[in-house]
Amino acid sequence: MSVHAATNPINKHVVLIDNYDSFTWNVYEYLCQEGAKVSVYRNDAITVPEIAALNPDTLLISPGPGHPKTDSGISRDCIRYFTGKIPVFGICMGQQCMFDVFGGEVAYAGEIVHGKTSPISHDNCGIFKNVPQGIAVTRYHSLAGTESSLPSCLKVTASTENGIIMGVRHKKYTVEGVQFHPESILTEEGHLMIRNILNVSGGTWEENKSSPSNSILDRIYARRKIDVNEQSKIPGFTFQDLQSNYDLGLAPPLQDFYTVLSSSHKRAVVLAEVKRASPSKGPICLKAVAAEQALKYAEAGASAISVLTEPHWFHGSLQDLVNVRKILDLKFPPKERPCVLRKEFIFSKYQILEARLAGADTVLLIVKMLSQPLLKELYSYSKDLNMEPLVEVNSKEELQRALEIGAKVVGVNNRDLHSFNVDLNTTSNLVESIPKDVLLIALSGITTRDDAEKYKKEGVHGFLVGEALMKSTDVKKFIHELCE
């Protein structure tokens, strides 16, 4: 049997609180194999001041039986004391303790799992940095933090396919937990996750910022290049196959994106987005049925339906777009349906032709991730397929690049795709630089009527809204408020 040995040992002092669980030994072993010095204490055999006197670099709360309120000993007090001082990580009950400490509810998870593996999706940060999507993780639990009681200071970082929370992280402090067992031999990439724990330092995430070269956009782009390359090799899905299908007339009729948006009599147009999750927010509505959501938007007066088709971080698919187009064709006359936008990280003609065949009227081109020659090539190719793209920018320089290629519909993303921080002034600062014949759409961060009203007064033509609409209890009212 091979033993894992770290190539570059991480010399950290870890205090491991044992909640009377046999898996504590596995956690200890994994930490030691990465080079850490580990001190283990039962949850009733040491005090918080005594732990503080040890001056640990990292605190780790182990798995354990029972409920965090009654069976975790000093674990919750440790989380309260060390939050903001050093990194605090929790496994299984350790995560449940975090949920409880910050005001959440730990309850029956809806299923009892013992030694079973489940694939998860995650946000690629913290413990999940550089961990592939869809890995199998080992679960031993019947309790979990409930999504409805998620504390405002925490964000969901990982979940199962049926929506059970598998990871949470404090938005400010280096406090993070997972419901599964990274130290189990059945968990994929467990050693990498333990190593990621040891690589975190200090009391805040601000102190652990990733360099731009490892930004979220870079990771998504790299993953999508792999995905597209693999799919384009499958018989029946090659570029030549797609081209043959297009030449046979299999692409459905389309509407002119620019004409639909510019001919609206509303004060502003709404591009309503089908969005199950995001890297910044984690799961939003994993059980959403794309066609149902799109129909709600269309009946409420949306001018376009944006369909996220990226599978790893946003939990979308091209089939979602196909289904959205089908339901719109069934429920609306050809000239009265909303346009369909493929919201994707596009870098190749393959993705554009794929979108056209699936029923998209337009595609998103992100200036930030494309060289100027490639941007121009993809824009021209889209036009050859009779699609006017939505060209996304985030700065005055990117806006100039978009205008140079002749873009007629420009979206200003208020979210920086490297850091994923939102600044609603990003759109406002570019309004005066937009030519009169170019439509300006504000993207990201629009959550209230006041946000929309400010933009309308500045001359913004419309808004792309995703998360706020996905969470809205009255989609029709919300869209009406945005438009009028």
Curated annotation (Swiss-Prot):
Name any one GO molecular function. anthranilate synthase activity
In the record, biological process GO terms are: glutamine metabolic process; L-tryptophan biosynthetic process
Q: Which reaction does it catalyse?
A: chorismate + L-glutamine = anthranilate + pyruvate + L-glutamate + H(+); 1-(2-carboxyphenylamino)-1-deoxy-D-ribulose 5-phosphate + H(+) = (1S,2R)-1-C-(indol-3-yl)glycerol 3-phosphate + CO2 + H2O
**Listed Gene3D superfamilies:** 3.40.50.880, Aldolase class I
Q: Which residues carry this modification: Phosphoserine?
A: 2
Q: Does the keyword Isomerase apply?
A: no
Q: Which residues form the active site?
A: 92, 181, 183
Q: Fetch the InterPro entries from UniProt.
A: Aldolase_TIM (IPR013785), Anth_synth/Amidotransfase (IPR050472), Class_I_gatase-like (IPR029062), GATASE (IPR017926), Indole-3-glycerol_P_synth_dom (IPR013798), Indole-3-GlycerolPSynthase_CS (IPR001468), RibuloseP-bd_barrel (IPR011060), TrpG/PapA_dom (IPR006221)
Q: Record's Gene Ontology CC terms?
A: anthranilate synthase complex; cytoplasm
The metabolic or biological pathway listed in the UniProt record of this protein is: Amino-acid biosynthesis; L-tryptophan biosynthesis; L-tryptophan from chorismate: step 1/5; Amino-acid biosynthesis; L-tryptophan biosynthesis; L-tryptophan from chorismate: step 4/5
User: Can you tell which superkingdom this protein's organism belongs to?
Assistant: Eukaryota
Q: Where does L-glutamine bind?
A: 64-66, 96, 142-143
Q: Which UniProt keywords apply?
A: Amino-acid biosynthesis, Aromatic amino acid biosynthesis, Glutamine amidotransferase, Lyase, Multifunctional enzyme, Phosphoprotein, Tryptophan biosynthesis
Q: Which residues form the Glutamine amidotransferase type-1 domain?
A: 13-207
Q: Which conditions up-regulate this protein?
A: By tryptophan starvation.
Segment Indole-3-glycerol phosphate synthase: which positions?
Answer: 215-484
The EC number(s) this enzyme carries: 4.1.3.27, 4.1.1.48
Q: What further fact does the record state?
A: Component I catalyzes the formation of anthranilate using ammonia rather than glutamine, whereas component II provides glutamine amidotransferase activity.
- Outline the subunit composition: Tetramer of two components I and two components II.
The name on file for this protein is Multifunctional tryptophan biosynthesis protein
Taxonomic lineage: Eukaryota, Fungi, Dikarya, Ascomycota, Saccharomycotina
